[in-house]
């Protein structure tokens, strides 16, 4: 029997990319899904394309409306009576040099990629504690383990997620709370197109590394396996995954390798 069968899973950033593919694959596994993103009409389309749309509810939200986190959680719990797994997938990337990036862009990235996730996760914590069970799944990035040019704000926000959720795991393991940090490498989504540039506008173009990355289908299969195994951390991608281990033992070598790669 599939360990995730009948679990209530709340996915943020569910309107596209990894979040959308997760919805499709989890629906095939007979999970009960709550899909969140800003655009209600897009969420409806994703729901209708799921294998079991009757077991899919949508909860439109803007993750940076921190003051509404408690009410969003209350609504999410009421939809099926509980939430078993919260998949924090909403986020935005960046493509700009530090010297050419407005400070406001850093604030926007931090609000979306870090504080929005923290707000929703903290709001649902009492529910997990009450049930003595709950699983946070956080879509971070390999950029949460090491850095790369043009992604300074994105790297900073993803590094922050690891700091927060490592503490969450330690403080609430005794309450049955689990944390899985998922670190994608290059995945073929529109993340580069929607990345913020130095003045806050969208890049609106893709790059070869992203286009040649893992398919969302392949990536999500591996991610779901990690969720079922309740792994602490998982790194999913191509050869770029080796950067995590090179960073740990040979940080100067990784510095040279990343600069040589000239990845945008």
State the predicted function of each range.
Residues 15-16:
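Conserved glycine-rich cofactor-binding loop
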Residues 29-46:
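Conserved glycine-rich Rossmann-like NAD(P)H-binding loop of the short-chain dehydrogenase/reductase
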Residues 60-71, 103:
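The beta1-alpha1 cofactor-binding region of Rossmann-like NAD(H)/NADP(H)-dependent oxidoreductases
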Residues 97-98, 102-108:
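Substrate-binding pocket helix/loop in short-chain dehydrogenase/reductase
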Residues 121, 157:
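Active-site helix of classical SDR
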Residues 141:
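Residue(s) in the substrate-gating loop at a strand-loop-helix junction
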Residues 174-238:
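SDR active-site lid
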